[in-house]
Amino acid sequence: TMMTMAVPLVSVYSSQKNPVFNAVLLAGRLRFNAPILLSRQEGMRRALKALKDGYPFYYLPDMDFGARDAIFAPFFGVPAATITGLSRLARATGARIVPVITRMTADGYEVELRPPWQGYPGESVEADTARMNAFIEDEVRKMPEQYYWVHRRFKTRPQGEKKPY
């Protein structure tokens, strides 16, 4: 995108066990202006430093990475294991949250920057995480064909609840 060509970004990715697939994943992510890519498995210390150094941080917080560092927050009316990193990073750094909406088009991508969220972080990590999920849900409802439905968003369940997959 034009943004990543003009402004170096920091982003997080999940390192893959298969070295060939991992190399392909990294090559795809590194094609825009050599962003700083941080492996999720390394933790968030480097992300905190990058934010404090003034780098924009491109963060995709709606993946189910399991129970670690997650809470259950509603997503389409279903409790979804949701990482709390967005709220925690905003609290630790004072970073403003600027939602980015990306649409695939026949010619590439359209990227829309929304106004920064007001009052975020709010009164609690739980409220912030529910707010984030509600925002994502609203955007998915507007263009469901754009969402990454192949990701098993509800694979981690509250204790005692049956897995849907």
Model-derived features: positions:
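Membrane-interfacial amphipathic helices and adjacent loop/beta segments
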Residues: 10-41
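Non-catalytic C-terminal accessory region of glycerolipid acyltransferases
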Residues: 4-7, 41-165
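Hydrophobic alpha-helical segments in the ANL/AMP-binding
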Residues: 1-3, 24
